[in-house]
Amino acid sequence: MITDPIADCLTRIRNGYLSNILIIEIPYSKIKKNIIKILYNQGFISSYKIEKINNYKLLIKVALKYNKYTGTSVIKCIKRISKPSLRKYCNYTNIPRVLNGLGIAIISTSKGLMTDKIARKKKIGGEIICYIY
């Protein structure tokens, strides 16, 4: 049984880019889909697709993105911040900058998941899910 499905999702992505795998599969949930959608919009992954398996189970297939010149992954580090055992919250004035603005922080707010830049612009705080750079 998985106690932290978000950490499982991030670990699958991390294991995928460390092993130079092109496509990974993640069990579906709404929050995982929103995290993957943010990664796609920010350019960290090349594509994603939601597929049905056996007419009832959903999977998210994620195509990881690699630098075409060096072959290295676009994602250098993906780190879970708020854990089930220790939640990390911040208001919009204390939202951390990841690598001085080069990376992103995914924040769960009352308006849904969003990046740190959008949360600062909308003046909304929330739970810091992860850092990606």
Curated annotation (Swiss-Prot):
SUPFAM superfamilies: Ribosomal protein S8 (SSF56047). One of its GO terms (molecular function) is rRNA binding. The keyword Ribosomal protein applies. GO terms for biological process: translation. The keyword Amino-acid biosynthesis does not apply. InterPro entries: Ribosomal_uS8, Ribosomal_uS8_CS, Ribosomal_uS8_sf. GO terms for cellular component: ribonucleoprotein complex; ribosome. It comes from the Bacteria. Gene3D superfamilies: 3.30.1370.30, 3.30.1490.10. Keywords: Ribonucleoprotein, Ribosomal protein, RNA-binding, rRNA-binding. Belongs to the universal ribosomal protein uS8 family. One of the primary rRNA binding proteins, it binds directly to 16S rRNA central domain where it helps coordinate assembly of the platform of the 30S subunit. Part of the 30S ribosomal subunit. Contacts proteins S5 and S12. PANTHER family: 40S RIBOSOMAL PROTEIN S15A. This is Small ribosomal subunit protein uS8. It comes from Karelsulcia muelleri (strain GWSS).
